[in-house]
UniProtKB/Swiss-Prot annotation:
Keywords: Coiled coil. The keyword Coiled coil applies. Residues 70-89 have a biased composition (Low complexity). Residues 529-570 form a coiled coil. Residues 298-316, 325-336, 386-395 have a biased composition (Basic residues). Residues 1-479 are annotated as: Disordered. Residues 20-31, 50-60, 127-163, 170-193, 265-297, 363-385, 396-408, 417-439 have a biased composition (Basic and acidic residues). It comes from Mycosarcoma maydis. Residues 36-49 have a biased composition (Polar residues). It comes from the Eukaryota. Pfam families: Nkap_C. GO terms for biological process: regulation of gene expression. This is NKAP family protein UM04995. Residues 340-350 have a biased composition (Acidic residues).
Amino acid sequence: MPTLAERLGSSAANASGSDKSSHDREQELRSRLFASKQTSRNTAHQDLASSERRSIDRELPLASRHRSRSPLSSPQNGSSPRRQRGSPSYENQPSTVSARMPPPPQPYIHPDRRPPRPQADRWVPPPREDVQSDRSPRSYPRRRDDQRWQANERRANQDDSRRAWTSSRSGDRRRYFDSNDDRNPRQEDREAPSEYGAAQWKRLQRDPYASSMSSGGNQGDGNGGFFSSRNEQRKKSTISIWPPSPPHPTLDSDEEREKRKRHRDSSSRHRDKDKDKDRDKDKGKRDRKHSSSDKHHSSSRSHRHHSSTSRRRRSSRHSEDDKASRHRHTRSSRSHHRDDDDDDDDEDVDVDGRRKSKRSRTKVSDGSDSGRSESETDSDSDARSSRHRRRHHKSDRSSTHRRRESEKRHRSSGQRSESESSLHSEHNQKETAKSRRDSVSASASDSDVEVGPTLPTVAADGKPVDPRAYGGALLPGEGSAMASYVQDGKRIPRRGEIGLTSDQIEAYEKAGYVMSGSRHHRMNAVRMRKENQVISAEEKRTMLRLQAEEKAKKEREIVSQFKELVDTLQPGSSEAK
């Protein structure tokens, strides 16, 4: 086994021969040996890896090669701008290729306590240029791969500032964020200026840290200057969806506010009127439909009945009975509808009046033939008077109508109209007198009633209330003073407000002060004396002694009274025995 001097050279051999016992020299030689072993191991590893990779490339066909562009599958060249990371000394295992001597012993350090690796030692991927230079053209079918190869060639011929790894990390960002390889070069050229407006599946996936990492040299490409291009696009746009802001706040004057309010009130009033008119029209239509349906029903029924009875001998009698029943039916249905719709307007009343005049004419014509003209005139006057009565007395309409109909059933047409006119006139006179009486009494009661709370004239026990009694717990002179305030019509001051006049107190209350006051000044004096009173120990003992003496005195009096009672009862009891 050769010595250290033989391995390091002749100079080291002379030095070691002259001074072999020096410990410092031994350490220096060991460090030199370790450095030489490290460099030889690195070169051996690189040679072995390159030879293995070349042999694999020769054995495997070109179509089965991995297409990944990751740095793990790319060959390592000596022209890389970043060197390969050298592992620390504690991770190195003794190599049998170039090391014949074990490394110097080192103390064991737990993995948790080992110092962290420096940032510069981290693995950095090599640039794309090395990958493109060593990669041979592929021989598998040229479908999309031909287009991809052309895109790669075009990308390789671009500016070196975008491709160099050291200038900017964003230049090689397509290694991780590349989804544009499958696109047609014509499509790429056409869609390049409008890259932001492209569809979501055609957009490039941008690096979120591109704007922070790139300083400004890569603003020209589509990936790095996204925010700046968006800002330029926003500045160039002339269309705005937001309304322009007013230059200054508009202050409405009082006149404009009043005009606006008046306009709102008038429009709401017009709307209410239109609604009322529509409602009245609907009611009128409903009433007309009901009456027409009743007429149609009764006429059809009478027609059927008349046609069936005309074949028999009693046709005239059946037709008369049917007419009477029909009139009764229409009267009952009409009175029912009138009771339901008591709140109709004057329009509906006129329509009902017209219908009623027609019905009265038909009744008179169906009745006796002798007094036809007189009954028609009477029925017209009756319809006019009933219309006037319905207009002014809607509440009594149904009752008078029923009474009139019952009279019509039993009397002739002429007598019926005369009695109705007399009844209507009497009823109108009664109603007018009653309304006059009610209005007079209401006006008198309005003038007599006092608004607000009143004092009770009778107490709870039934005795009349004395207006001069202002309470039970009053000091002498307070009642008369309160009576004088009441006679003058002034406010009675509360207790504790003696220093102020009633006008001053009222002014304070109007200003917002609560002038309730405290109790009487005597009570205040007693309260202050009791608060400031301090009882000493001697005073307490004297008070207890006085209380004990009073108690003993009371007990002696009770015992003496009991003895006297016993002495008076004993002689009587002995004499009785």
